[in-house]
């Protein structure tokens, strides 16, 4: 969330691409940020509705794109200069390479136009043979943030281990000094749980809420 705020607060910021593996929390994080920081959120999901890619197959004039999106989405597409963010989810699932290429070119047009912010999310972007990613993306047309599953430290925070305790553990680890046995046993327990639960946000939240491994394994 901090990186998203830094991006928005940067003067003249470019369209943003948030990439990472599926289910690592990209869509949730982006939509949560968008709803809290913009008056209007226009949302497209190319995985659920691949036909949306056709919006970017014709003219890349921003007013034309806005008109087409307004026609497709109706009242769910409100475009107000400086108050609207366009969220393009699962951009790698554009059904045609040509449309995908024009989609990435469109980012440059949105940057030049400047009236509306654009945030795209993508899974496995840049992985050879996956999706319909264009061979090249215009240099300087976008800002990219990589998102990863929760690491062990973040897993500790989610399970109620405070930052001062984590800092103390890190200090002891660096100095190779022992910690109290009760704390050591608790960390071993959490490490084993992390090995099973993993770092995907849905799985971690389910575990935090239920403390039941069978609930986690159903995800």
Residues of each region from the PLM?
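Conserved lysine of the Walker
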Residues: 26
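Sensor-1/coupling segment of RecA-like P-loop NTPase cores
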Residues: 111-134
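Structural recognition of the conserved hydrophobic beta-strand(s) that form the central parallel beta-sheet
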Residues: 87, 117-123, 146, 155
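Short glycine-rich substrate-engagement loop in P-loop NTPases that contacts/grips substrate
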Residues: 48-84
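Interdomain hinge/linker elements that couple catalytic modules in large macromolecular machines
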Residues: 160-219
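Hydrophobic positions on the alpha1 helix immediately C-terminal to the Walker A/P-loop
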Residues: 29, 33
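Short regulatory helix/loop adjacent to the ATP-binding pocket of P-loop NTPases
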Residues: 126-142, 156-161
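Pre-Walker A adenine-sensing motif
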Residues: 1-11
């Amino acid at each position: 969330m901090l990186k998203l705020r830094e991006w928005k607060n940067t003067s003249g910021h470019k369209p943003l691409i948030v990439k990472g593996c599926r289910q690592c929390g990209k869509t949730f994080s982006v939509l949560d940020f968008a709803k809290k920081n913009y008056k209007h959120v226009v949302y497209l999901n190319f995985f659920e509705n691949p036909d949306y890619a056709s919006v970017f197959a014709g003219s890349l004039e921003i007013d034309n794109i806005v008109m087409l999106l307004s026609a497709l989405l109706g009242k769910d597409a409100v475009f107000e200069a400086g108050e609207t963010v366009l969220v393009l989810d699962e951009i790698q699932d554009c059904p045609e390479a040509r449309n995908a290429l024009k989609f990435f070119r469109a980012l440059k047009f949105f940057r030049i136009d400047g009236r509306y912010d654009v945030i795209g999310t993508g899974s496995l972007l840049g992985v050879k043979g996956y999706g319909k990613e264009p061979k090249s993306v215009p240099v300087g047309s976008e800002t990219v943030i990589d998102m990863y599953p929760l690491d062990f430290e973040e897993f500790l925070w989610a399970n109620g281990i405070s930052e001062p305790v984590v800092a103390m553990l890190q200090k002891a680890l660096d100095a190779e000094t022992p910690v109290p046995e009760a704390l050591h046993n608790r960390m071993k327990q959490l490490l084993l749980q992390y090995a099973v639960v993993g770092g995907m946000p849905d799985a971690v939240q389910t575990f935090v809420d239920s403390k039941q491994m069978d609930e986690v394994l159903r995800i």
